[in-house]
Regions:
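Flexible loop/turn segments at secondary-structure boundaries
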Residues: 23-26, 49-52, 140-142, 154-156
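Short, well-ordered helical secondary-structure segments
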Residues: 6, 16, 20, 51-56, ...
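Amphipathic alpha-helical substructures
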Residues: 1-40, 156-179
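Long, ordered, helix-rich scaffold segments
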Residues: 12, 101-216
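A short, hydrophobic C-terminal helix/tail in secreted or cell-surface proteins
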Residues: 217-222
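Beta-strand-rich binding/interaction modules
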Residues: 12, 26-91, 96-103, 107-110
């Protein structure tokens, strides 16, 4: 870290906290689009849950790499007041707003590209957004992550069907997207294999944690 500071003439004191603070940081992200001003805003909130050795946590310097795509898959230029911006957002405060100008139409955000930081990400992606990222994102991690979230959505939906005694089904749109991956697998066989791999059991179970806690609390009240 010291060498990086000297080479780039920057203060990385906050970044050093990664080496002394335990636990996995979480990023809660929401967005808004203003059609009148063609402005897109990302609101990012960071937190790190208390751990046995550290109940009090401090804000970290979290590099959040992003990309924005329009509905046709064209990558948007990141700019603010005519000035080009880096695709890495420096999250250093508990709550921050990042504003992008010249965005014509609500974009699809690819968040945490290249897994730019070891954090948990909470953003309410729609199925349509995930299908778009899987189809045209130029970042391999973003495509793989979109596929994992799509699989999780489908698995959760079918668990609900099973609980209600209904038949299993897979969204035709998801099948079409996966078929597209297969049709173009020769471009990157290793990536295609990863994209078509279902989430691990523990990762899928983790996605149910909030739901199970809510159900347990409701049962206790009864």
């Amino acid at each position: 870290v010291s060498a990086m500071e000297r080479a780039n003439d920057v203060d990385l004191a906050q970044f050093r906290r990664w080496y002394s603070q335990s636990g996995t940081p979480e990023l809660l992200i929401s967005d808004a689009y203003d059609e009148q001003t063609h402005t897109y805003r990302l609101t990012v909130s960071q937190s790190t849950p208390p751990t046995a050795d550290q109940m009090e946590k401090v804000n970290l310097h979290i590099p959040l790499k992003i990309a924005l795509y329009d509905a046709k898959g064209t990558k948007q230029m990141l700019q603010h007041n005519g000035e080009l911006l880096s695709d890495v957002l420096n999250v250093t405060e508990k709550d921050q707003v990042f504003e992008f100008h010249g965005i014509y139409g609500r974009p699809i955000p690819a968040l945490l590209c290249d897994f730019s930081a070891p954090v948990k990400l909470d953003y309410d992606y729609t199925t349509e957004q995930l299908l778009g990222l899987l189809k045209f994102a130029d970042n391999q991690f973003a495509r793989w992550d979109a596929a994992q979230m799509l699989f999780t959505q489908e698995l959760r939906r079918n668990v609900a069907h099973f609980q209600q005694g209904e038949a299993f089904e897979i969204s035709p749109d998801v099948l079409t997207a996966l078929a597209h991956v297969l049709e173009n697998y020769e471009q990157d066989i290793e990536l295609a294999t990863l994209i078509l791999t279902l989430p691990k059991d523990i990762e899928f179970a983790e996605s149910f944690k909030t739901c199970l806690l809510y159900t347990s609390d409701a049962a206790d009240e009864l």
